[in-house]
């Protein structure tokens, strides 16, 4: 199961496809999200 845009995420949760976890929220990878 993956998390959608804007959902809270953590070290052990995965955001869906093109999203990544940034400051505890799933955001679009293009914004830039460190190396997660």
Swiss-Prot record:
Please give the Gene Ontology molecular function terms for this protein. ion channel regulator activity; toxin activity
Which InterPro entries has this protein been placed in? Conotoxin-I_CS (IPR013141)
Which keywords annotate this record? Disulfide bond, Ion channel impairing toxin, Neurotoxin, Secreted, Toxin
What tissues contain this protein? Expressed by the venom duct.
Task: Report the locations given in the UniProt record.
Answer: Secreted
Provide GO CC annotations from the record.
Answer: extracellular region
Cysteine pairings via disulfide bonds = 2-16, 9-21, 15-26, 20-33
Q: Which family does it belong to?
A: Belongs to the conotoxin I1 superfamily.
The record comments on the domains as follows:
The cysteine framework is XI (C-C-CC-CC-C-C).
Q: What is this protein called?
A: Conotoxin Bt11.4
Q: What is the lineage of its organism?
A: Eukaryota, Metazoa, Spiralia, Lophotrochozoa, Mollusca
């Amino acid at each position: 199961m993956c998390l959608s845009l804007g959902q809270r995420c953590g070290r052990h949760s995965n955001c869906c496809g093109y999203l990544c976890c940034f400051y505890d929220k799933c955001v679009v990878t293009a914004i830039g999200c460190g190396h997660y």
